[in-house]
Amino acid sequence: MKTFNANCLLLVSLLLILASCVIPESNHVRPTYHLLSELGAEGNESLPPGEVSFYVSQVELPTYLQDSRLVSRPSEGLIEFRENDRWGEPLEEGIARVLGLNLGRRLNTFSYSVYPHRKKVSCMYDLGITVQRFERIDSESILLEAICEIHFSKKVNQVRFVKKIELASAGNGEKSANQDVRALSQAIDEFCGFLALRISSSAAGDPDD
């Protein structure tokens, strides 16, 4: 009888040990990583190739945009971070990269560099970008607000840019993070068009610039 009880106790102990080794199914969802992209802006053929050179210095962001997670601000004073959608590079570097690509194409030049790379020698324009808003603001749109200081020929011209873009719906009618990122890329492209006009006018000697 004692042997039977001992065997039962041993069997129960083994079952408990095996049960403790079972790994529960994970609820972890791997995040999706996103990159801002160039949208193929048209070049300015009125400018000779390489006529303009520029440098995009380190983009300044508010603290909440320095997080790797995509951000939404559905109402004033409320921020929502998306755990499963993240930037694939530091956001300030991604914005500078796409600014350089789009602005270089619009100004018909390869003579540019962007942070974190060093400024090229004899650079004509130094652009200091401060981004104040860069996120989805409701279920239908994103918002870009930025200030740019254009340093040229010992002068500084400060300009402000605001752009709201409606989101395109996915096939099922929902607004996904991919639509957000594409709309944010479009906002940067339009910001570059705005800056290119300013730079082109100063390069042409516009007296009002």
Task: Please state what every model-predicted region is.
Residues 1-10:
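Bacterial N-terminal signal peptides that target proteins for export
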Residues 21-92, 203-209:
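A structural "domain/chain start" motif
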Residues 23-43, 50, 106-156, 173-174:
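Surface-exposed short loop/turn segments
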Residues 78-86, 155-194:
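Short secondary-structure boundary motifs at beta->alpha junctions and helix caps
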Residues 92, 96, 100, 185-188, ...:
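Extracytoplasmic/secreted envelope proteins and their assembly/folding machinery
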